[in-house]
C-alpha cells in the first residue's frame, strides 16, 4: 500500500511544473532550506524564494519516492535553463501539508551561470 504522503509530494511537484504555487500543499509555517538559501521559515519566505526559481524551470520529473510515516524522501529532476539538475529532497508532512522541506543538490550549474 502506498503511503498517502507521496501523493502530497506529487501535488507539490505538480504545482512547480505548472508554475502555480497556490496549488502547492505547503504549511503556512513551513521550514525549508537548500544549497542556495539559509534555513528559512514561513509561507511568504518560501513563496518568494521558489517564485524566483520558477522562470528558469522547464519541467519537473519525479524519479523515486521513499516514504515512512510522516516523511517522504524524493529523488526528482528539475529541467532548467541551466540543464537537468538532480535533486534529493526530504519532506515532513503534517495534516496533509508540507511542514518541512530540505533539498540537496549540486548548485554549481546555477551559481556558475550568475
Per-region residue spans from a language model:
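Short N-terminal helix-initiation segments at or just after the protein's N-terminus
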Residues: 15, 34-39
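Alpha-helix initiation/capping motif
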Residues: 1-2, 39
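A beta-strand edge to alpha-helix "cap/lid" segment located at domain peripheries
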Residues: 7, 17, 33, 44-114
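Short beta-edge strand/loop motif at the mouth of beta-sheet-based domains
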Residues: 28, 38-48
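Short acidic-aromatic low-complexity motifs
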Residues: 2-28
